């Protein structure tokens, strides 16, 4: 009789331990984690506003802009009245700019930077590109981001987001 009670408690304990281990395994495997980008590798930036591109690019291009003179050759200021109407001022003593420019298009185009990540010897610029219906006019989609000058010597690689 004593052995039979001990046996049933022992079996019950094994079942509970197995159930606990299985539950812990399932809970740990259900969590989704984005470990691809380490927090220390993210490069902060500010998106520059109220500029227009001067020129006609025939293919997508990334331009690194390191001086006010280069900025003035590539972009004009598009100020307007009201809040937020001034073009973003860029201090080229502390920062540089990265411009991503697409060719002219008559399709509705939304282009926006998503992230800038430091990899071993380059910066990865991830962006979102959505194109819609044809319009009756042409635009030249682009964005400009302002980055700390300590990253100026890194090459830049663009990565389109497929969200």
Q: Model-derived features: where do they sit?
A:
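Exposed, flexible binding/inhibitory loops of compact, secreted disulfide-stabilized domains
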Residues: 30-163
């Amino acid at each position: 009789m004593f052995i039979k009670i001990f046996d049933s408690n022992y079996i019950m304990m094994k079942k509970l331990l197995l159930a606990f281990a299985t539950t812990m395994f399932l809970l740990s495997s259900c969590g989704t984690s984005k470990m691809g980008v380490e927090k220390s590798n993210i490069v902060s930036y500010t998106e520059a506003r109220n500029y227009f591109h001067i020129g006609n690019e025939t293919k997508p291009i990334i331009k690194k802009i390191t001086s006010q003179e280069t900025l003035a050759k590539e972009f004009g200021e598009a100020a307007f009245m009201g809040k937020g109407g001034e073009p973003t001022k860029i201090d080229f003593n502390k920062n540089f700019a990265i411009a991503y420019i697409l060719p002219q298009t008559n399709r509705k185009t939304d282009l926006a930077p998503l992230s800038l990540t430091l990899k071993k010897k380059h910066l990865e610029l991830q962006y979102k590109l959505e194109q819609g219906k044809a319009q009756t006019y042409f635009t030249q989609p682009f964005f400009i981001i302002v980055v700390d000058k300590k990253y100026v010597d890194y090459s830049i690689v663009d990565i389109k987001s497929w969200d």
